[in-house]
Amino acid sequence: MLSPSVPSDPPAPLRHPKLLLWAVCALALMSTAGVALPYPILAPIFVNGPVDDFTHFMGLRPELLMGLALAVNPAGILAGSLVVGPMSDRYGRRRVLSITITATLVGYGLSAYALASRDYPLFVLSRFATGLTEGNVAVVRALLADWHPQLDRTRSFAWLNASLYIGWLVGPLLGGLTLPWGEAVPFLVAAVVLVPCLVLLGVGLPDDRPAAAPEGGLLAAMRRQQSLGLVVQDPVLRHLALLQLAYTLGVNALYEFAPLWMLQQADLGSRGIAIVTAVQCAAMTAASLFAARIGSGPVPLHRAARFALVAAVGLLALSLAPSWLGLVLIPALGIPLSFYNALMPAWMSERFAAHGQGRVMGLLTTVFCLSNTMIAIIGGVLGMLSARWIMLLGGATCLLAAIGFIRFARRHS
């Protein structure tokens, strides 16, 4: 039998369930804004920054150093996600969120100090440490799931996704607009943004600590609930995870290195990059809300495969496009990515429910973070040639995944 991922005792009735939903969405928005804030500023910091021990640490190229700085954060999220989920089951969602958000705030402060002191090793270490505590989305989703049916799960998740996309809109905009004030300033802003999150936790979320700790220790809970074991247990999920890895390599090529593309090909600074990124996130927010309104339809897997194909074509076009067309393609690519993100998790949630929702959604997070780390390292090397090569690689892996998804859908939908 599958072990339950949350305590079996139902939560007490909520007096104001909509207030809780709004508090959780606001918490997710502000937390994600802090996570997204550094993305449009790393390319200008490293590639256009001064020639010193930070941007040319150990004589290495700035593109390589930027790739490593990009890679360590999702690597930290990947490692932290194996701990944060079981901890929230054992000690309560609110308590774990309080600890992780406080630790993230401290991590942003360390990143700001490392930039101010031009200490590249400390910057990389702080980005990894911050990643360890940034994987809060799974905990927030679990919190909303705990309160079903007092909060409708489908509608709550739709609002949560929209809040996350708005966070990805607000964060890059803040980062790009504050970078001219100093390289450390965006990270200080990210830390300040998290302070209202801690206030919301205290006043907006009920105390959900279990009356008694679940049987077994934390390590036993982690072994029981970790997601990677699913690829060993289920050959269908293993096949799907490999396709998802190829697809998210392309997606993360866009997420991580579109700022470098805009810097190299369109000569945009931090503010221009932030504006384009904000437009992309706005498109993703609108597409996510539209996808929630129209639902998944009768053949969600086939539709997800088609959107993956559209994304692949867009990435391949971006690798060849002139600067003006690329600045149109980058925001437009957010639309098929959002529809895919709405369809594929919904289909997996229904198809593999027997494995436990937390583990299945955790597998998607694990694959995404793994591909994020991989493309950050590979892209750091290819970026020394041109960001176009990164988009070409991302488009190729996305195209292979899309073809595989189409065949997979014919067999398993």
Language model: regions and residue ranges:
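Hydrophobic core of transmembrane alpha-helices in multi-pass small-molecule transporters
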Residues: G107, Y120-G135, L325-F339
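Central cavity-lining transmembrane alpha-helices of secondary-active solute carriers
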Residues: G67-G85, A278-F290
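Juxtamembrane intracellular "pre-TM" segments in multi-pass secondary transporters
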Residues: V6-P17, P206-A241
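C-terminal ends and interior cores of transmembrane alpha-helices
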Residues: T102-S117, V310-A321
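Cytoplasmic helix-loop-helix junction between adjacent transmembrane helices
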Residues: S126-L164
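Helix-to-loop junctions at the C-terminal end of transmembrane segments
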Residues: A79-G92, A287-P300, G383
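Short amphipathic helix-loop junctions that connect adjacent transmembrane helices
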Residues: P40-E63, E256-G272
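Cytoplasmic membrane-interface "Motif A"-like loop-to-helix N-cap segments
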Residues: R90-I101, S296-A308
